[in-house]
Every structure is written in C-alpha cells, then in structure tokens.
C-alpha cells in the first residue's frame, strides 16, 4: 500500500492518480471522512486522520510500503509558523522507526533555514528531518504554483486588474501542481536507489505581465498588472485575513522569493503544462 498525505489537493491528487494508474493500492490521508460512494468511484481508499495524531498516523504508516509526505498548510488566521512546525514534528515522529521502502517529500524552491519565512523555513526543516530517517528519501522541490493565480481570476474579470507582489517584467519559474504530483508519484514508485532532491518547473518561466495577458484571454477583457509595493506587503496580507504572525512570515517569504535569495537549479525537470493550459482549469 502507498500512503499519500495531502491527497485531496492538486499535487497529492495527481500523485495518487499516478500511483493508482500504475496498479498500486493507494490510501489518501484526509482531514475529513470521505463518503464510501466517492471511494468506490475513484478506486482510492481514504483514511480520516489528524496529522497531529502521531500514534494513529504511525499505525497507518506501519501498514504502508511507501509514503508521500505533503505538510498541510495551516490556517492563515493563526500562527502558521507554529502550527505548520507542529505538523512537521508529528509527521516525522510518526515516520521514525517505521520500515518503509521509500519516502517522497513535497517541498519548494527556495527552501532554506529560517524561523519566520513561511514554507521556505518549515519545509526546509521537513527536508532535513526526512533525510535523517533510515529510509530512502526523494525530495521534490517545486517552483511557484501556477494555481496560486487562480484566486485572481474573478477579480480580474470584475475589475480588469491583477494585483500582485511580483514585478511585471521580472521572470519567475512557475509550474502546474498536477505536473508536480505526477513527478512525485513517479518517484514514489521508482527504484529505492533513486533518492535526493528533484527540482521541477514548467516548460517556461513567466512574468506577472504574462499572467495578465493569459487572464485577459480567459476573462474576455483587458487585464492590467497592479504591483503592491514591498512596504505594503504586510498590510496586504493582514487585509486578506492573515494574523499578525502569518502576515509577517508571508511577507518575509515573499521578499526572499521576489529577490530570489536562493540558488536556481541548473537542470530541473520540466513539466509539460503551460501557464495558459493550467489557468484554463480554474477559469
């Protein structure tokens, strides 16, 4: 059995489908109970487990051959740094000592040490903890998810404006989450000798102006980029419902991302899904 954490999101669902299509039994860990009728429909088994319930999670891992680990995002209304580190700690504790064939960990471009830099610091700690397990480990570091732009579609349609933290002419690596999940699923099934960090981005890099151009075609009206200056990032996050702690952490993460304070991989895996094809799924 292959266990998939986060299997109801874009990445986890694609990973689960990749493994299922290859003929393996798949159990997806969810926060809520999934109806039996839905389980029969997609062929996947579902286990409603709170990832902070370390003992129950370990019991599930003990029945598995291989595990895909995706740390669930915490509610931005709380302290995301604290809550996401709690789940990382629980997941790693549940994995420790379990005789698994292989573990694949979902991470991000720019993962680096840091207390208050959002996913960059949290997922770096997850990477380090996983690599300390006595198990073959693959780490998938993904570029900026194209799906992050989906939330802007309705506003672009209504106002003709794309608000963003990203400068309009600066190029950023981006990737469709479905391509990330497909790679994760392939690595989960690959030989145990295949380990280490695997970077993935899309077929091209894009600017926020490229995103606006695609949105223009999708919503049928001109869309202009409106850049939020760095001195207003914290305020913008707070206005979107983030707690003080989460807003500061995300603002710090955004700064590291925009100013590219990380090493770009020289030879990443290239997903096949373009910006426009991916955004059409959410339009």
Give the label of every model feature segment.
Residues 83-88:
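Aromatic "clamp/platform" in nucleotide-sugar-dependent glycosyltransferases that forms part
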């Amino acid at each position: 059995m292959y266990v998939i954490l986060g299997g109801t999101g874009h990445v986890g669902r694609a990973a689960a489908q990749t493994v299922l299509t290859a003929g393996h039994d798949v159990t997806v860990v969810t926060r809520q109970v999934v109806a039996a009728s839905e389980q029969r429909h997609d062929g996947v088994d579902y286990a409603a487990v709170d990832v902070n319930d370390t003992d129950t999670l370990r019991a599930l891992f003990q029945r598995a051959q291989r595990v895909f680990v995706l740390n669930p995002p915490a509610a931005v209304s709380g302290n995301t740094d604290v809550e996401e580190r709690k789940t990382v700690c629980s997941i790693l504790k549940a994995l420790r000592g379990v005789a698994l064939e292989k573990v694949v960990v979902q991470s991000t471009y720019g993962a680096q040490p840091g207390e208050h830099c959002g996913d960059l610091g949290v997922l770096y700690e997850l990477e380090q903890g996983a690599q300390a397990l006595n198990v073959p480990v693959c780490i998938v570091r993904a570029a900026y998810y194209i799906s992050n732009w989906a939330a802007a579609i309705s506003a672009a349609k209504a106002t003709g404006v794309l608000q963003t933290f990203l400068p309009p002419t600066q190029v950023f690596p981006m990737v469709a989450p479905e391509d990330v999940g497909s790679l994760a699923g392939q690595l989960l099934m690959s030989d145990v000798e295949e380990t280490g960090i695997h970077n993935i981005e899309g077929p091209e890099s894009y600017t926020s102006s490229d995103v606006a151009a695609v949105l223009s075609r999708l919503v049928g009206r001109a869309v202009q980029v409106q850049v939020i200056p760095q001195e207003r990032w914290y305020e913008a996050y707070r206005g979107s419902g983030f707690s003080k702690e989460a807003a500061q952490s995300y603002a710090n993460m955004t700064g590291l991302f925009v100013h590219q304070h990380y090493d770009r991989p020289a030879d990443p895996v290239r997903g096949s899904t373009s910006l426009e094809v991916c955004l059409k799924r959410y339009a």
